[in-house]
Amino acid sequence: MSEERIPKRSEVPEQFKWALEDIYATDEKWAEDLQKLKAMPERIAAFKGRLSESADTLYDFMQLSDEISVLCDSLGNYAQRRSDEDTANAKYQGFLGQLMNAYVAVNSAGSFETPEIISIEEDKLQKFYEDKPELKLYKRALDKLRRKKAHILSEAEEKILALTGEMGQSPENIYSMFSDADLRFPDAVDKDGKAHQVTHGSYIPLVQSEDRVLRKSAFESMYGTFDKFRNTCAATLSAQIKAVNFYAKARKYESSLEAALDGTEVPVSVYKNLIEAVHDNMHYMYDYVALRKKLLGVDELHFYDLYTPVVPDADMKITFEEAKETVLKALAPMGEDYLAILKEGFENRWIDVYENEGKTSGAYSAGARVHPYVLLNHKDTLNCMFTLAHEMGHAIHSYLSNKNQPVVYSDYVIFVAEVASTCNEALLMQYLLKNTEDKKQRAYLINYFLEQFRTTLYRQTMFAEFELKINEMVAAGESLTAEGLNELYGELNKLYFGDGIVLDDEIKLEWARIPHFYYDYYVYQYATGYSAAIALSQRILKYGEPAVKDYIGFLKGGCSTDPISLLKGAGVDMATTQPINEALAMFGELVKEMEEAMS
């Protein structure tokens, strides 16, 4: 593919485009199914007030829910994928708008589902299972819904809570508008006096630069700007945390953490174990910080020195064909069945490979009933090869869950999602290290791996600890001020990175830059997922077929049980600190290997 000019969609060869005709042969077929969805509210309404009348009625309603899920899956995938391949195409924006209107009507028509199912008496529900054994298929789904009974309020109270919904979103919306739309950063200046635009998107590439003057300038531009608005940022974050605690209290949870984790069936202890395990392994990060300082040859290491590669000029050129071949070889330990699905995806146009005008940026995998779809914007880099392995990990997880679970349990939760993708990355990395003899390239690979550990395991855990602490402060009646938040965030950076790095005043403001603090206990899942993936990749390489069998069983599991049980079946117990300790021990070994490779 030419790099001089980004091609139009029509200029991209067919074999590099995803096969959306596998969902609908034509746009007209999509429109026919949309009409079916538009007719669903009437079919749903026929069940209102009747879910407790008989086993047959409840079963028929659950079957209708499955039918709607399958229909929405096809309609949503086709419209969203078509829109993403060329965002300038107004036709598919229109499709998405029509679909959203139909979704809203369906959801509104089915608003009676939760209250009616929750109100069925336990004895009666057990009798339903006896009267109609087919209903047992939905037992887990019904139990999950009914588990919330203790946290569902009276009808009048629920109405009031529902009215606060938009208000509860306000802190995130205000922060998003402020940070993404209103904030402007002064240009960063490099060692030659050349100006570089600083945006949220350009910031990381700028602090990855070999030019230290530019790195420092970008760092000061970013955090100097946030410093001017520190009280505004503290007020929006405080409002967000107060809202989260209000909803937890209103729904009779012990804490905001318990409320957030309850929906995904993850015990609170898993969150706290993560923080404890990382605390116990801080020495590895201190070793890495010391090594980074030594390799960069600086008198003092600053936070703007953390992102620049210590082996800057060893990147490899890897074409898409080479990337596919290497990924196939690297994932050979997964066994023939896994590789067959991977080849099917490569050969049957599951992947939209290259950039074109108007195409959505980045990369993702989308599970669909026919087969998954993967969006890439492939450049011939090492990073893009890892992205291919990562997204195909998600894709095969979706494929196996869809093929092996009934519709109601075919989706998987975020807590396990990153495991399947990151396990592939870990296997690819270990394959490359085993098969790379060039000293400089090995060091480049190890540096890449170490940075994943730093940014995913240590950094996200630090975020998770900060989030927990500010929630505890609000729950205890303390106020969140800019000064207090800066102090807490500075202390955590000192704890996580040690004395080998200068605690720049600017880094104390980083909390103001992180949108994830508005996502309600979300970030910890990156760290737990990464730990589980590292542990499972090691297990697969060590034990072979039995470990692979366990792992494939996990990929087939969808959400047929809770995420901790699913991962336990794969061979990793996230209810303990062991997987995190093992992953961090591997990080420690890699730091040593990096030191040897660069000596």
Question: Language-model segments: which ranges?
Answer:
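Active-site recognition of the HExxH zinc-binding catalytic motif
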Residues: 252, 379-399, 421, 426, ...
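Long, K/E/R/D-enriched contiguous segments that form extended
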Residues: 295-333, 339, 373-374, 397, ...
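Catalytic zinc-binding patch centered on the HExxH motif and its immediate surroundings
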Residues: 316-318, 351-370
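Short pre-active-site segment immediately N-terminal to the catalytic Zn-binding motif
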Residues: 316-318, 370-389
